[in-house]
Amino acid sequence: MSLFDTIRNTLVPVHKEGYIFVGAFFVGSLVLGWIWEPLFWVGLLLTLWCAYFFRDPERLTPQDDDLVVSPADGRVSMIQMVIPPEELQLSSDPMLRISIFMNVFDVHINRAPVRGAIRQVVYREGSFLNAELDKASTDNERNSLVIDGPRGAIGVVQIAGLVARRILCWSVPGQALGVGERFGLIRFGSRLDVYLPAGAEPRVAVGQRSIGGETVIAEYGSAKGPVISRRS
């Protein structure tokens, strides 16, 4: 491994959405240090934590249309057959839902579980219940995407939680997403739901940790052998 690769793998970049927060924390550190020098170091630690929260690491994403990758880092909190929210306009029949809960220490970048074109993006206001509750999927503030993937349309729902009060989505209808491509983030703890059509089988278990853009959470059909992965 070259020195450049070592540095790149060690220093994880900060996503641009975090620049203003990191900058504000650092300025606050300078002000605190001017008041009393030891407070500067407290502020600096908080600045480093803020940079850590908005970290945006590269991922090695499997390139196989029969695989569905995790949309976020976190813990698999639910795997259920449920009727998707009305705003997705996907099906009146139950679909496989896999939920990923992100705590404040997880990477909060959200990634496309499959490749495809965005059919719609729908934002809904709502409550800020604990994102681990089942009813958070219908009661909480959320932003929903429908992606027309190679094995059918899927739903991806960003759900705000107790602490998370800001959902960001920079992707728009008609945009083509590659599998593992970044489409948004949620600040300070939240949940991602993925709704999958018939034929998808879960490949994770409740309680398992997932890595956004890398961990295979579901699969269509059977494995066909080695899978190529690309950086995303």
UniProtKB/Swiss-Prot annotation:
Pathway: Phospholipid metabolism; phosphatidylethanolamine biosynthesis; phosphatidylethanolamine from CDP-diacylglycerol: step 2/2. GO terms for cellular component: plasma membrane. It catalyses: a 1,2-diacyl-sn-glycero-3-phospho-L-serine + H(+) = a 1,2-diacyl-sn-glycero-3-phosphoethanolamine + CO2. The modification Pyruvic acid (Ser) is found at residue 190. The keyword Lipid metabolism applies. Is synthesized initially as an inactive proenzyme. Formation of the active enzyme involves a self-maturation process in which the active site pyruvoyl group is generated from an internal serine residue via an autocatalytic post-translational modification. Two non-identical subunits are generated from the proenzyme in this reaction, and the pyruvate is formed at the N-terminus of the alpha chain, which is derived from the carboxyl end of the proenzyme. InterPro entries: PS_Dcarbxylase, PSD-A. Its cofactor is pyruvate. Binds 1 pyruvoyl group covalently per subunit. GO terms for molecular function: phosphatidylserine decarboxylase activity. One of its GO terms (biological process) is phosphatidylethanolamine biosynthetic process. Its main location: membrane. The record marks 189-190 as: Cleavage (non-hydrolytic). It comes from the Bacteria. It is a peripheral membrane protein. The active site is at 190 (schiff-base intermediate with substrate). Keywords: Cell membrane, Decarboxylase, Lipid biosynthesis, Lipid metabolism, Lyase, Membrane, Phospholipid biosynthesis, Phospholipid metabolism, Pyruvate, Zymogen. Its EC number is 4.1.1.65. Belongs to the phosphatidylserine decarboxylase family. PSD-A subfamily. Heterodimer of a large membrane-associated beta subunit and a small pyruvoyl-containing alpha subunit. Catalyzes the formation of phosphatidylethanolamine (PtdEtn) from phosphatidylserine (PtdSer). PANTHER family: ARCHAETIDYLSERINE DECARBOXYLASE PROENZYME-RELATED (PTHR35809:SF1). This is Phosphatidylserine decarboxylase proenzyme. It comes from Allorhizobium ampelinum (strain ATCC BAA-846 / DSM 112012 / S4) (Agrobacterium vitis (strain S4)).
